[in-house]
């Protein structure tokens, strides 16, 4: 019997949609999470050995646009109670990526077999939070309309280095009409904890992107003739940096398959 089924049989209060989403992941549901548990904050994941944690924490502090930390575990502790009830970082994402010496070696649906007592988990803000605010203002979001993952690209924008961690910023892209893009800048500026305002509008080649139809992560989406690409700093940046640093061991989320927390998106707005 699942935890959710047992909870229902006990006649307890309804579970938060965020906890239901995590329990679904724990049961092996490996679906992309855009639009899942509306109203709740989602996060990117990076897990590193303790000896690298301080350098990575500093890297995030130096690069708050792509790497805004919303949660951090104690050493060896897979639970992050500040982010959610009964949250287990080893099982509660749809899919993970395991890295050794900068190479992707596994993409499991849980990391129980990979967990170690020296690991520290970092949860980094995700643009899915500000997408809710965009939708509330009737701004269309193409990848949600199509039911695919947001397209993400490595750029020529260099992150500030810290220890072994250095490399390019990764950005997510959403096509918008110019007037909608201006409104999107205004809306997302209210959410610095989840990447804030865009880092670039239009002209993808000027930030090192040669073909929008071939994202480095996620899925391509069509851009209409009356639209421009709008780029936000992205929490997949640590994956590019971890690969470039060739650290001996690391775990991340699979792009587009995030951790759903119990935090509310409205808690992250600054205005």
Swiss-Prot record:
This is Putative hydro-lyase RPE_1692. The keyword Lyase applies. It comes from Rhodopseudomonas palustris (strain BisA53). InterPro entries: D-Glu_cyclase, Putative_hydro-lyase, UPF0317. The keyword Mitochondrion does not apply. Keywords: Lyase. Gene3D superfamilies: PSTPO5379-like (3.40.1640.10), PSTPO5379-like domain (3.30.2040.10). NCBIfam families: PRK05463.1. Its EC number is 4.2.1.-. The lineage of its organism: Bacteria, Pseudomonadati, Pseudomonadota, Alphaproteobacteria, Hyphomicrobiales. It is an enzyme of class 4 (lyase).
């Amino acid at each position: 019997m699942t935890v959710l089924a047992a909870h229902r049989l006990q006649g307890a209060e309804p579970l938060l949609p965020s906890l239901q989403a995590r329990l679904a992941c724990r049961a092996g549901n490996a679906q992309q999470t855009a639009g899942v548990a509306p109203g709740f904050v989602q996060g990117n994941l990076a897990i590193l050995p303790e000896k690298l944690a301080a350098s990575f924490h500093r890297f995030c502090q130096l690069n708050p646009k792509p790497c805004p930390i919303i949660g951090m575990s104690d050493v060896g502790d897979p639970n992050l109670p500040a982010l959610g009830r009964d949250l287990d970082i080893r099982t509660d994402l749809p899919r993970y990526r395991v890295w050794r010496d900068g190479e992707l070696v596994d993409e499991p649906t849980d990391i129980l077999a990979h967990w170690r007592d020296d690991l520290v988990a970092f949860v980094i803000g995700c643009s899915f939070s500000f997408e809710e605010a965009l939708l509330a203002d009737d701004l269309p979001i193409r990848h949600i309309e199509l039911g695919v993952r947001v397209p993400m690209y490595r750029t020529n924008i260099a992150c500030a280095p810290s220890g072994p961690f250095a490399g390019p910023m990764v950005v997510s892209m959403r096509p918008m009409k110019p007037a909608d893009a201006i409104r999107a800048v205004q809306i997302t500026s209210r959410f610095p904890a989840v990447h804030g305002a865009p880092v670039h509008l239009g002209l993808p080649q000027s930030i090192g992107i040669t073909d929008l139809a071939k994202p480095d992560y996620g899925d391509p989406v069509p851009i209409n003739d009356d639209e421009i690409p709008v780029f936000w700093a992205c929490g997949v940046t640590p994956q590019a940096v971890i690969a470039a640093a060739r650290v001996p061991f690391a775990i991340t989320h699979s792009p587009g398959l995030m951790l759903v927390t119990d935090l509310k998106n409205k808690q992250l707005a600054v205005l």
